[in-house]
Curated annotation (Swiss-Prot):
Keywords: DNA replication, DNA-binding, DNA-directed DNA polymerase, Endonuclease, Host-virus interaction, Hydrolase, Inhibition of host innate immune response by virus, Inhibition of host RLR pathway by virus, Magnesium, Metal-binding, Multifunctional enzyme, Nuclease, Nucleotidyltransferase, RNA-directed DNA polymerase, Transferase, Viral immunoevasion. Residues 220-258, 292-319 are annotated as: Disordered. SUPFAM superfamilies: DNA/RNA polymerases. Gene3D superfamilies: 3.30.70.270. Pfam families: DNA_pol_viral_C, DNA_pol_viral_N, RVT_1. One of its GO terms (biological process) is symbiont-mediated suppression of host innate immune response. This is Protein P. The record marks 63 as: Priming of reverse-transcription by covalently linking the first nucleotide of the (-)DNA. It comes from Hepatitis B virus genotype B1 (isolate Japan/Yamagata-2/1998) (HBV-B). The keyword DNA-binding applies. The lineage of its organism: Viruses, Riboviria, Pararnavirae, Artverviricota, Revtraviricetes. Residues 178-346 are annotated as: Spacer. Multifunctional enzyme that converts the viral RNA genome into dsDNA in viral cytoplasmic capsids. This enzyme displays a DNA polymerase activity that can copy either DNA or RNA templates, and a ribonuclease H (RNase H) activity that cleaves the RNA strand of RNA-DNA heteroduplexes in a partially processive 3'- to 5'-endonucleasic mode. Neo-synthesized pregenomic RNA (pgRNA) are encapsidated together with the P protein, and reverse-transcribed inside the nucleocapsid. PROSITE patterns: RT_POL.
């Protein structure tokens, strides 16, 4: 007869009427019993002939793809002018005095952040915007382009202007102005009106002087992977290949690719016409994909071009119509859905390309992308705004993958010890936290996004037209892309974007200037940044608490009035550093803080209500006696694992599920196992904070017997059959807890100390977790353990009781000013006659 739920509870000693613990508990370690129970509960039966279930409630498993929903009404979020102050370390020093080693190190990491991948794969521009929504191709294209344009305008992206130069908006940082190691000095060239531009201005080296000496010095600079000929050295006169031969090698780095004539005609001409000509010519050059536009000769790091406003006159007035969009103007309509009807709607479509306020030299940047982008809902609660997803997963795959740095996240117990108190809480919302952290320009060539332009994108996706060679578009090729769908989409988009349609239909390549979300380095850098800032705030206000996890910052103070004044002071401090706090999204929590999915109050920690609801729903939908695909099990375990520490039996109760997932087998829930789990998750017990105290109770065991020292009392017992040592130590700890009721037990076993009972026999792990819930352990070396003698059967010899103080841990979150120094990477040699055993002093 299969095991009933009541019987199973009795077996696990979850009921009160169980026999004496010293007899019952060792039985649960018996392998035979564990195997019989597993068979009864149908836990280890992988060979099932029934087809697997691939969906349970909202959890989908193998062979199912969730189709993302496209929203044509998505709003692009606005990004404030985010500019983290460069002298952030000095500002923190003014605020709190000298910084600790840890804070200094963390802030240096992000000013600027550097990124050195092992290998970078460059993808064609067609892969820039992912065809994630096949039904809404054009719509998605323009929304994504608009999002990218918004990011560029907000100073979050660089725009690639040529192989070696890029432009950007916003305030420049010092590393964007001087070349590495101060070799070449930064000069600003303000080009206003008709002022002619002096060819020999200081800091601009004439071509001949950029000689091999500087080339070789530059080659050693740490700007990441170098082009072979010295990163900023001018190419040999005349360039190489037919494309570059048309680039006139002028010493002052003019933009513009001219067929002939002298190099500085653009500069001396009036700005408006020069810009006009440049944009026309630049368009012509664009189709030749990789043109180096004379910039390789300029010796400056950044030229700050201030383009006058009147320069954005339309290019359609008499200049070369090399632009796909404007060519429709002069062509005959091919049908009633021809694009020329749209292009003829207005005369002035604006410029073909926009240029940033500042220009910067970059390492060689190919006209390619390294990751694709697509849009999704901003979050499950906000579907009106979109969020840009950037896929730079190439850096995390294959043999050349980058191993991202690890960083400490406080576990549940540390978090509770830290935040469970009678303080009042509020949480701050940092808007676009990732986009605060600046990246070194050398990383730009590795983090490129962009698009190939509307014509290529549409041609790529429409089955009836082949990809056209756009070097010389003939009229026939031009109309290949006309279709009813495109026409209707563009007419609707014209209402939204107006003449920007023209700008967005051009190809563009953008590199990140601030850290993007799709790279494994970003969470690490953000965590370092916010934890350093919180550390500074904690030291400035020692009677308050500030804590952060990624972009979630919480403040706690003794009273509400105190909290409000703290909030004002901290917000002003953050704003002075250039951090954007969104005051509308500040949440005041009262005494129970909602943080990282938990509710934390003075009584301890519990999961938030929405997680409890999800768990209830999960059990309601969970089928019995049907094999469930392991991918679904993985998602179920993800949800249940989060709340496991709040149940009686904890993680060990989920072990059968873990085992089937790692074997990639289907799992069948028997009615008893399902009833057991749902009962476990019905009543959740808070995880309380640990208190410091003196340890008075000690446990020890040998494979054959156990011993306890409770105050001045000694006890011992033997096991019916010898047990593995870790199992014996765990049993001894359970006996100590049940005999003495002490919350603090001394043990010399590291596995018991770690409180992870998942590797023990399943039934024992579940029972021990319940018995030892809320117990803290203190390490005591065997030589000094008072319970050592009783466990070996000797009751006569008394070792004096130790005075072992216990301090609860807050993980690696140091709340005190003296943060630990950085450990050296080479550990000191540990001698076998360890000082711990010889001259051991209580911690």
């Amino acid at each position: 007869m299969p095991l009933s739920y009541q019987h199973f509870r009795k077996l696990l000693l979850l009921d009160d009427e169980a026999g004496p613990l010293e007899e019952e508990l060792p039985r649960l370690a018996d392998e035979g019993l564990n195997r019989r129970v597993a068979e009864d509960l149908n836990l280890g039966n992988p060979n099932v002939s029934i087809p697997w279930t691939h969906k349970v409630g909202n959890f989908t498993g193998l062979y199912s793809s969730t189709v993302p929903v496209f929203n044509p009404e998505w709003q692009t979020p606005s990004f404030p002018d985010i500019h983290l102050q460069e002298d952030i370390v000095d500002r923190c020093k003014q605020f709190v005095g000298p910084l600790t080693v840890n804070e200094n190190r963390r802030l240096k990491l992000i000013m600027p952040a550097r990124f050195y991948p092992n290998v970078t794969k460059y993808l064609p521009l067609d892969k820039g915007i992912k065809p994630y929504y096949p039904e809404h191709v054009v719509n998605h294209y323009f929304q994504a382009r608009h999002y990218l344009h918004t990011l560029w305008k907000a100073g979050i992206l660089y725009k690639r202007e040529s192989t070696h130069s890029a432009s950007f908006c916003g305030s420049p940082y010092s590393w964007e102005q001087d070349l590495q190691h101060g070799r070449l000095v930064f000069q600003t060239s303000k080009r206003h009106g008709d002022k002619s531009f002096c060819p020999q201005s200081p800091g601009i080296l004439p071509r001949s002087s950029v000689g091999p000496c500087i080339q070789s010095q530059l080659r050693k600079s740490r700007l990441g992977p170098q082009p072979p000929q010295g990163q900023l050295a001018g190419r040999p006169q005349g360039g190489s290949g037919s494309i570059r031969a048309r680039v006139h090698p002028s010493p002052w780095g003019t933009v513009g690719v001219e067929p002939s004539g002298s190099g500085h005609t653009h500069i001396c001409a009036s700005s408006s016409s020069s810009c006009l000509h440049q944009s026309a010519v630049r368009k012509a050059a664009y189709s030749l994909i990789s043109t180096s536009k004379g910039h390789s000769s300029s010796g400056r790091a950044v030229e700050l071009h201030h383009f006058p406003p009147n320069s954005s006159r339309s290019q359609s007035q008499g200049s070369v119509p090399s632009c796909w969009w404007l060519q429709f103007r002069n062509s005959k309509p091919c049908s009633e859905y021809c694009l020329c009807h749209i292009v003829n709607l207005i005369d002035d479509w604006g410029p073909c390309a926009e240029h940033g306020e500042h220009r910067i030299r970059t390492p060689r940047t190919p006209a390619r992308v390294t990751g694709g982008v697509f849009l999704v809902d901003k979050n499950p609660h906000n579907t009106t705004e979109s969020r840009l997803v950037v896929d730079f997963s190439q850096f995390s795959r294959g043999n050349t993958r980058v191993s991202w740095p690890k960083f400490a996240v406080p576990n549940l117990q540390s978090l509770t010890n830290l935040l469970s108190s009678n303080l009042s809480w509020l949480s701050l919302d940092v808007s676009a936290a990732f986009y605060h952290l600046p990246l070194h320009p050398a990383a730009m060539p590795h983090l490129l996004v962009g698009s190939s332009g509307l014509s290529r994108y549409v041609a790529r996706l429409s089955s009836n037209s082949r990809i056209i060679n756009h070097q010389h578009g003939t009229m026939q090729d031009l109309h290949n892309s006309c279709s009813r769908n495109l026409y209707v989409s563009l007419m609707l988009l014209y209402k939204t974007y107006g003449r920007k349609l023209h700008l967005y239909s051009h190809p563009i390549i953008l590199g990140f200037r601030k850290i993007p979300m799709g790279v494994g380095l970003s969470p690490f850098l953000l965590a370092q940044f916010t934890s350093a800032i919180c550390s500074v705030v904690r030291r400035a206000f020692p009677h308050c608490l500030a804590f952060s996890y990624m972009d979630d910052v919480v403040l706690g103070a003794k009273s509400v009035q105190h909290l409000e004044s703290l909030y004002a002071a901290v917000t002003n401090f953050l704003v002075s550093l250039g951090i954007h706090v969104n005051p509308h999204k500040t949440k005041r929590w009262g005494y129970s803080l909602n943080f990282m999915g938990y509710v934390i109050g003075s009584w301890g920690t519990l999961p938030q209500e929405h997680i409890r609801q999800k768990i209830k729903l999960c059990f309601r939908k969970l089928p019995v006696n049907r094999p469930i695909d392991w991918k679904v099990c993985q998602r179920i375990v993800g949800l249940l694992g989060f709340a496991a520490p709040f149940t009686q039996c904890g993680y060990p109760a989920l072990m059968p599920l873990y085992a089937c997932i790692s074997a990639k087998q289907a799992f069948t829930f028997s009615p008893t196992y399902k009833a057991f789990l749902s009962q476990q998750y019905l009543n959740l017990y808070p995880v309380a904070r640990q208190r410091s105290g003196l340890c008075q109770v000690f446990a020890d065991a040998t494979p054959t017997g156990w011993g306890l020292a409770i105050g001045h009392q000694r006890m011992r017992g033997t096991f019916v059959s010898p047990l593995p040592i870790h199992t014996a130590e765990l049993l001894a700890a359970c006996f100590a807890r049940s005999r003495s009721g002490a919350k603090l037990i001394g043990t010399d076993n590291s596995v018991v100390l770690s409180r992870k009972y998942t590797s023990f026999p399943w039934l024992l792990g579940c029972a021990a977790n319940w018995i030892l819930r809320g117990t803290s352990f203190v390490y005591v070396p065997s030589a000094l353990n008072p319970a050592d003698d009783p466990s070996r059967g000797r009751l006569g010899l008394y070792r004096p009781l130790l005075r072992l103080p216990y301090r609860p841990t807050t993980g690696r979150t140091s709340l005190y000013a003296d943060s630990p120094s950085v450990p050296s990477h080479l550990p000191d040699r540990v001698h076998f006659a360890s000082p711990l055993h010889v001259a051991w002093r209580p911690p």
